């Protein structure tokens, strides 16, 4: 026996050199070699898919099977030594076709098929195993389950014999074939039995030998016990047959080599010729011997796993179910391929998953740039790689595993997709809100009117386009979850919600501006009306044109001013609200709130006017105007002969009538409160609790308030009214006393003896004046001037003019003195020292005055001034 050290037997070290000539698939102890897949990888057969062919050789021990394979396929199987007659091939060995063909000696169409794998099966009828035929049966079953072509190696002189022609082995092959067919009832697997007749001398024609073998095979087939339904089946239903003869290797070596060369050309792909139909009704085989129907349809990368599973079933004496084995292989390989595909998928997707998870955990989801292309490429590559490897396996299993892979991939991609849309949703809503607010502020800064509805519509369209662009860029075509319509609908609803909120906020800001405008206008107008109460005369207190307004109709005028102002505000509010695309319900609620707020403004203003201090001041002014001035508005100069008591009583009683008049808001025309409840109207049905929470309850309007309209219109209570009457009377009494004192003051001011003393002491001067015509005339003129001045009541203006002239003269003197002092050095130094001292004192006094002013005026600067400055120019 020639032993070759470049075969990898079961259990040997697995270096690359050990696979040079082949691998032992099953050893003599019936153990399967787990390194078969490594050998196929070493020979680069694994990537071939279905583009490979498997041949097994059968025959009696020591009949030259290995020698035939070595010459035919260039393999290096161990062969028997010429000097010994014993078993050389133990178990089953596998090697790839190593035959080197010369292009100049071979037609390219006659080239051997690619990736031919040859299995050298242990010979039968050997003395080493004796009567133990278990391995023969198991190896035959294994070869038939895996191989396309079964080469039967026999000698010419054995044709016609039973044992010598391996008819016993062939009977075993036929039996296990039927066994396999029973399990695979969906198809009829076919194989090729290739009889190679050795030491063929040609005396008996090859056709006769072929006929003899076919007769023996048919006889064996007929003798088999067939399962139900297959009683009439023939051997040709499962097998095709081919025959070849080879000369004696030792006696005709050159011819043997030539015939082997010719025989090798038959090991190529074949097809059936439909124009040349055989006895079975199928086309004859043309070309080579490898028909597609012989192939077991096991991809090369799964052959090792499949073969191991088949052998495990065989060696454990279990029923061999090839379809089940193919499905198990498909499941195993598809799972492996799926895991490999997911590795590359993980490398591409995991970074984005981590970024998205971190952003969500931080509470600020962010849109991941470049996610869409990565998702599409990762999914496409994973499915493509899976299809390339797994599509060659069992179709049902392949489809099932592909669906599982796509489900795993799509589950993760869908999570990324939804996370991306969620981030785009949040950022889009935020950007939309900020953009609308920025556009509104820009319009307010420009001072021009802006269309809020147009701003919202434009920004909303931009936000939707941005969201759809991001969603489309993240879509994965053909994925079942690649539909963002639901998310888009939710996004649009959120934009609508935000738009509504922004519109309501803008409506509230508009209402606030209108309220400020109403407050400003009402404040001015009501101030004028109440200030008119401070003038009881028809002169300075009366309007510039027309008569003095009647005090009894003050509430009518206030109500008219109020209604006109609010109607104007409503018109402005409605015009501005139309640019917000506000609904009728929102406008109704806004107008209803405006009327209620405006009434609150008016009532607050009235309460301010009728405060005790303000009202007493106006009552005093009203009384003084009526008491100190006549009906023409001319000041009264009280004389002792005037009826001061009558004028005082009339003025006081007239002023006292204002207190009950101002105590209640009543219209003079109806002597009833104004129809405030009808004017404000009922609460709109669309009003929400939020619309009412900041409103002040109004008596007679709000039923839950428990206060009537009459009570709402009461501005001064009874106790306060009595107090005002008492205090006013005291004030009026003081004015009366002052007037009375001034009337009698001219008489009692100069004593009578003073005139006698003046006459006695000034007699000489009096006589000198009377005797001198010039002095007398001057005295006469002065007396006439004094009388006229007195009658015209011009002494006051003359005194004031005199004081002003003297003050101006004093200032002019100071200025001239200052100029004089500045002309000398001594004067300048004195002025500098005096100026520094005065500046220090003025600074201290200024600080005191400022602090006092800040405490007293802070409230008005924070309220009245701010309100006036904030009033929108549009209103």
From Swiss-Prot:
A single Gene Ontology CC term: endoplasmic reticulum membrane
SUPFAM superfamilies the record matches: P-loop containing nucleoside triphosphate hydrolases (SSF52540)
Residue ranges of every copy of the GB1/RHD3-type G domain listed in the record: 49-307
GO BP annotations, alphabetical order: endoplasmic reticulum membrane fusion
Record topological domains on the Cytoplasmic side: 1-749, 795-875
Region annotated Disordered, chain positions: 676-704, 831-875
Name of this chain's protein: Protein SEY1
Transmembrane segments: 750-770, 774-794
Protein source organism: Blastomyces gilchristii (strain SLH14081)
